[in-house]
Every structure is written in C-alpha cells, then in structure tokens.
Swiss-Prot record:
The keyword Repeat applies. This is GTPase Der. Transmembrane segments: none annotated. The keyword GTP-binding applies. Associates with the 50S ribosomal subunit. GTP 2 binds at residues 184-191, 231-235, 296-299. Pfam families: KH_dom-like, MMR_HSR1. One of its GO terms (biological process) is ribosome biogenesis. Residues 354-438 form the KH-like domain. The gene is der. GTPase that plays an essential role in the late steps of ribosome biogenesis.
Amino acid sequence: MPKPVVAVVGRPNVGKSTFFNYLVGKRISIVEDTPGVTRDRIYAEVEWRNKKFTLIDTGGIEPYSEDKIMQQMKRQAEIAIETADIIIFMVDVKDGVTASDKEVATLLRKTKKPVIVAVNKVDKIGELPADFYEFYNLGFGELMAISSIHGLGMGDLLDEIFKYFPEEDAEDYDEDVIKVAVVGKPNVGKSSLINRILGEERVIVSDIPGTTRDAIDTFVENEHGKFVFIDTAGIRRQSKINEKIEKYSIIRSWTAIERADVCLILIDAKEGVTEQDTKIAGYAHEQGKASIIVVNKWDLIEKQTGTLEEYRRTVHEKLGFMLYAPVIFISALTGQRVDRIYGLIKHVADQAAMRISTGVLNDLLNEATAMVQPPSDKGKRLKIYYMTQSSVKPPSFVLFINNMELMHYSYERYLENQLRKSFGFEGTPIKFILREKEKE
C-alpha cells in the first residue's frame, strides 16, 4: 500500500517551508522572509502515530517571479490537485484573507479531494484573533489554527489529516502476478515503452483501477507469466499541467515504486545518468525493489566496437549502489530488444523471491570467513556465529555476531559478493540484519 501524499498549498510567505521543516524535523527547505525562496528539496516522509505519509511543499515548484504571482499560485494548486490525496491550504492570520488566497481557494474548490485550511502564525491557540474567523469565507468548513514556527496546533492538524487517509486495503492481485513500475525522469520515453510493450504483444491486456487515486493499472498475461504495469494512465498522460513542474512526476514515481515488485528504471541514452535518475534509482534501492536499468533511445547513439560495454560500465559507475541491476539497451521507438524485457522482469522477480536454506548458507559463511578473516579492532575480532534468511523481496539475512561495532561495511559487502557469486540474486538488493548473540 503506497503512503498517502499530502500537499501544502498557499501563496508565498505564509509559512509553508517552516511548517514542512517542523514536521520533517530537519531543516530541508531554505527558509527566508523573501517570497519564493523554497528551491531545495520539496518532499519528505513524515511519521505520526505510527503512520507514514509523503509531504510535499509546493513552494518548491519554481523560483518566484513577481510578474507571474497568480500563475505561480495556480500552478501550485493544480499540482496539489493532480498529485495529492489530501491538500493543506495554508493562509496567514496576520495578513487576513488576500486576493491571492481567494484565487487559490477558487481553484481548490474544483477538486473532489479533501482540503484542510491551516491558519498559520496564530501565537495563542486558546485566544484566536478576530481576523481568524474571516477565513471561513473561503468556504472549506472547519479551520485549523497553527503556528509553524512554535509548533502549536500541529498535533490537531495531523489528526485531522489522518481522518482523510485512504483505508489500508491490501493489493488485490494474486501472488503470481508481478507488479512492474516503469519509472524515469520526464521525456525519457516511459509512455513510448509502455505502449510498445503492451502493443507488440498478442496478449490479454486490460485496464483496471489502481489502488492509488486516479491510477490505472494494466494487466498483461503472456508466455512469461502474469504482469501488472502500475499507473499506466499517469505515464501515458504525462503531465497535463506544465512542463516546468514536471519535477512532480518524481512523486508519482515513488508511489509506483512502493507498490512494485520490479522497477524498470529508464535512462536516456543521449543524456546518460542524470541527478534525477540517481534519485529515482536510489529510492528503488532504498525500498528494496528488484530493478532493471533500461537505457532507451539506443538507436540515437553512434556505435563502434565496445560502445555498449563501455556505456554499461559508465552506468554502473554512476549508479554504484545498484551494481546488481542488469542493464538492457533498447529503443522504444524501433522496438529494438523490447521483446527481452518480459523475460528479464520474470528473472529478477524470481531472484528477489529466492530462499536459501540455513544449512547451505552456513556452509558458505564458513568458507567465506576462512578465505577472508572477519575484521578486528583493538585486539577484538568479529565473530559471526551463523546466518539465516529472514525474508524475501528483497532477500534479507540475519547475521548473529559477537559485537556490532566490529562489523565493517566493507566486510558486509564481501559477504554480499559471496552470496551473489554462489546464488545469483541478480537484479535485487540484499539486506543484512545484525544481531548480537546474547552472552552466555
């Protein structure tokens, strides 16, 4: 089940970034008193009462431009409507209701999504100023009084947000269905690839509502198995709003990644691996998802002997945390190698679901520790008593050891390489969980 998405909307300087930073607990956005300075990170995960959601600060869409203020407001509201499950409409009690607030309100009234009005800069929650009640005229019902800078009223606001969270339904797909997310930056060819994959195959293809907002998933069955391509509507439609705010397609990518078994991470062959590619791939890695790096537009590259292998090395250098992911070079336009994608998806999904018995694992562990001794520090050596597999998707292994502080990252990497050498695990991250064995 993907995390709900909450967007904070409002005109510049009402305190969106301060609110964002207070909830996230670290100063991610740049906070100054100049309207439009939120240019840094625009999203973060927030946890409240053991539930998580993704918070978006819409102030980070694009630098503020004085002559385009209403255009900017409109874009923020449109993004919130497009992307979020719940919208926080932030206003400033000290300024009262402004013309800009009314303009945003008009746009937000067009959505069927819940809108919560947060009246910011209220210094005493128990003594509301007369101006507070003006905001009822915006027409969204109950108002929430907060002070982002002092953290007042935040708990009540979060509780109000929670009332609108979708119920946590389990995915209703059978276990043998592989859920696939096609992710990548704007204009990398996601839409072309999806249409090529679905169009080329003589298969059963049906559109079904996804579990998230207006997502449409596409079910495919062929000789390789059963597949669901997540949120194909969002990919096909791209953004109806404006290219400048295509940054927000990354939010849609995360939601798809969270639901997926396998991620197809698209790279533009002409551009190479960009910062945004690294962020998307990094998120798939952090979420423990099996992944395939798909280099699209390969038909546009001039080739000579060794071009492909050299490009593969460069991709792995840039995405050093994802050396386990196979790289395939395709052209969604011409169809080059697209027919290999289904087989590769099935292969990495099987690898991510592989289980190894404890006996076999410990034979490997004994060999590995005999070949390369575990690290030591100040005369104390790391002892690894035994290893067992705790889960799959991604394959996760518990190492029972004598002292957590003696384990080095480099030795974990060595053990991971030994596991891969013996069993494969191609396309999937491997996770280690360290447990200190209780001293007798």
